[in-house]
């Protein structure tokens, strides 16, 4: 799992450069209450986000899913959208902030 998470982070760093704000593991894997069927929840927050960039991020993560034969649930947000979710006290933003483990 550590190798997979390291690969996600390093691959995204190459793709996004200084546009990447944070990559966070959250959900059952971060809390430690996962089982063998649990997916891996990853939140990726970037400074700016276009439709094309979002597609590139999902493609990169899909390649890693195939390589490691795992299911990765990927949430990609711009800095602005993440701030909006936090301000509106949306559960997903709270979960990422509270239980998330930065990669």
How would you describe each model-predicted region?
Residues 38-44:
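Short beta-strand->loop micro-motif that forms the acidic, two-metal-ion catalytic signature
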Residues 1-21, 31-32, 36, 47-103:
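Catalytic core of pol beta-like nucleotidyltransferases
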């Amino acid at each position: 799992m550590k190798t997979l998470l390291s690969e996600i982070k390093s691959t995204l760093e190459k793709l996004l450069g200084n546009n990447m704000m944070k990559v966070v593991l959250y959900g059952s894997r971060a809390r430690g209450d996962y089982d063998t069927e649990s997916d891996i929840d990853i939140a990726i927050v970037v400074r700016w986000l276009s439709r094309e960039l979002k597609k590139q991020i999902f493609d990169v993560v899909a390649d890693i899913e195939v390589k490691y034969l795992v299911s990765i649930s990927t949430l990609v947000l711009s800095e602005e959208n993440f701030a909006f979710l936090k301000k509106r006290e949306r559960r997903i933003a709270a979960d990422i902030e509270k239980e998330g483990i930065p990669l």
